[in-house]
């Protein structure tokens, strides 16, 4: 490997929005990373399902295809 071209590989603290923190190593500057989901709160790892924006998607779908249903009903 060439000397003096690789970024510094330092200990970094990762903080999740759920409050969970853990330490890893990274080339990120500042020594800390903030994430929205981690293995402690992600539905895949916890086994609990969370609905994020289903209501908005359903409403958007119904608005989009309401005209089609009205034409079929006539």
Swiss-Prot record:
GO terms for molecular function: metal ion binding; rRNA binding; structural constituent of ribosome. One of its GO terms (cellular component) is ribosome. Its cofactor is Zn(2+). Keywords: Metal-binding, Ribonucleoprotein, Ribosomal protein, RNA-binding, rRNA-binding, Zinc. Binds 1 zinc ion per subunit. GO terms for biological process: translation. Disulfide bonds: none annotated. Zn(2+) binds at residues 16, 18, 38, 41. NCBIfam families: L31, PRK00019.1, PRK00528.1. Binds the 23S rRNA. Part of the 50S ribosomal subunit. Belongs to the bacterial ribosomal protein bL31 family. Type A subfamily. This is Large ribosomal subunit protein bL31. It comes from Salinispora arenicola (strain CNS-205).
């Amino acid at each position: 490997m060439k000397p003096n071209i690789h970024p510094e590989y330092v200990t970094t603290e990762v903080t999740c929005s759920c409050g969970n923190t853990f330490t890893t190593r990274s080339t990120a500057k500042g020594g800390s990373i903030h994430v929205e989901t981690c293995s402690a709160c992600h539905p895949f790892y916890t086994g609990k399902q969370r609905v994020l924006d289903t209501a908005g998607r359903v409403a958007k779908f119904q608005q989009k295809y309401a005209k089609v249903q009205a034409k079929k009903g006539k």
